[in-house]
Amino acid sequence: MSNFIMLIGLPASGKDAWAKEYIKEHPNTQVYSSDDIRKELYGDASHQGSPAKIFELMRSRTLSSLREDKDVIYNATNVSFKDRRGILSQVKNLKKEVKITGIILATPLKVCKERNCARERVVPNFVFNKMLSRWQTPFYNEGFNEIKVITDPQSEVAKEYSGKVFHFGDQKNPHHTFSLYEHCLRCYMSLISQKAPVEVCLAGLFHDWGKIFTQTFDEEGIAHYYQHENYSAYMVLEMGGSLEMAQLINYHMLPYNYKGGEATWRVRLGEELWQKVLMLHQADKEAH
């Protein structure tokens, strides 16, 4: 059986370093990196070129190696379900026994940005925001046999985030009566009173923390928090929260956002996780 390892993480989260360490113990593993292919095709890893061409070549080489029973590390950001879906489907459809592992490098955003500034090739700040807005925590039904989270929680990061949430104040949106802190606390207490599973309760406490990064205002001065759930999910991972907490937070807005499409996501997430998502979603609604 060969191994397919997909790295998942923001720029400067440590994907290259993780791959190098892994290779020391597993020297026959092939590493395919989107940055390396950009450099190969265009002479510069920062040259975006044609993403379709880059990833088609990356997928082709990956599948070829797996057919030869070689282990592969697939090194790209892979932050969204859409980013991961194509290659995972192709690997699953190989007439080979392949173990598929997802490695999430949930390095604190602050650390990623510090590392980024120290690199020769600096990724613009807006790219971090774009990737966080697209962040979708992996789930097993995507095709993974195993998902691991690698992080280094830093107490000052949690203190900074909690302070901002506590002092955030009025959410400036007619759908929210309570402050951000009060809303999250009410959601948490509601789930506690229902004797919900512990991961669901904790997800309720943190589910909207991403709003501290995503507040925008419309022409009438009403605040909106688009993709806040994606930010919240990553924040939980970087603070040392569990994979399931991040999954619940990431997908608790699905019943709002995919009217008529719930059945698709119900199948994708699996019945057990979907029921927990609905539990969190309902508590969130009632805590407004």
Each predicted region: which residue ranges?
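Pre-Walker A (Motif I) flank of P-loop NTPase domains
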Residues: 1-5, 68-70
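Conserved GTP-binding G-domain of TRAFAC-class P-loop NTPases and closely related GTPase folds
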Residues: 4, 8, 13, 21, ...
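Conserved substrate/cofactor phosphate-moiety recognition/catalytic segment
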Residues: 17-70
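ATP-dependent NMP and nucleoside kinases share a basic, alpha-helical "lid"
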Residues: 40, 66, 79-121, 134-139
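Active-site metal-coordination segments of metallo-dependent hydrolases
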Residues: 54, 80, 172-186, 219-231
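Short catalytic-loop micro-motif centered on adjacent basic/acidic residues
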Residues: 71-76, 102
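Acidic/His-rich, divalent-metal-binding segments that scaffold phosphate/diphosphate chemistry
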Residues: 151-217
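Divalent metal-dependent catalytic cores for phosphoryl transfer on phosphate-bearing substrates
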Residues: 190-287
